[in-house]
UniProtKB/Swiss-Prot annotation:
Gene3D superfamilies: Helix-hairpin-Helix base-excision DNA repair enzymes (C-terminal), Hypothetical protein, domain 2. It is an enzyme of class 4 (lyase). Its cofactor is [4Fe-4S] cluster. Belongs to the Nth/MutY family. It catalyses: 2'-deoxyribonucleotide-(2'-deoxyribose 5'-phosphate)-2'-deoxyribonucleotide-DNA = a 3'-end 2'-deoxyribonucleotide-(2,3-dehydro-2,3-deoxyribose 5'-phosphate)-DNA + a 5'-end 5'-phospho-2'-deoxyribonucleoside-DNA + H(+). [4Fe-4S] cluster binds at residues 192, 199, 202, 208. Binds 1 [4Fe-4S] cluster. Keywords: 4Fe-4S, DNA damage, DNA repair, DNA-binding, Glycosidase, Hydrolase, Iron, Iron-sulfur, Lyase, Metal-binding. It holds the Pfam family HhH-GPD. This is Endonuclease III. Residues 113-132 form the HhH domain. GO terms for biological process: base-excision repair, AP site formation. Its EC number is 4.2.99.18.
Amino acid sequence: MEIKKLNHKNRYKILKMFSNIYINFKTGLVFTSNFELLISVMLSAQTTDRMVNKTTQRLFGIANTPSGFISIGLHAIRENIRKLGLYNKKSSNILRTCEILLKRYGGKVPNNREDLESLPGVGRKTANVILNVIFKKKTIAVDTHVFRLCNRIGFAKGTTVLTVEKKLLNIVPEKFKLNFHAWFIMHGRYICTSRVPKCSKCIISSLCEFKDKNI
């Protein structure tokens, strides 16, 4: 049986429900400055927020500014993030990003997409998170959880993250855009999980169009 896409009314209901249960959630990453969030998001590729937070608790105790990272150098950065995936590439990108932040932006995190995406290791998703969380821009970052959830429940289907992002920007009401990413992260991480979604505990199961619900 063909599964039809959600209509506007049911999408709105889902967002309204999420706004009530995930009201206080912003991001799972722990940070105390714009720079710390930038580094944390750069580290989060192919790893969990829990592992990133465990790593940055130690790392930020050693250095938590661009100049601080340059002072400790590449080897120290690499050794402190060794337990994370892609640590060699990430450590190199972090050091180069710190150099650029000091040279071009006075050590501050830029507040626009073009400048953010010019930083080594900062792609569209990372830029969207920074613009959304720090600068309160109504961007929608589409990561693994958001991509899976949008396709599974029929909220916004697409074969690429960019396709899904563009659809979301068109269909999500303005008042929900600022928090959309955080809500879908929570639901995808703890309820609509990758292998065995917890459909019996899901508040949107009656609206979801996933055909293999395990209720």
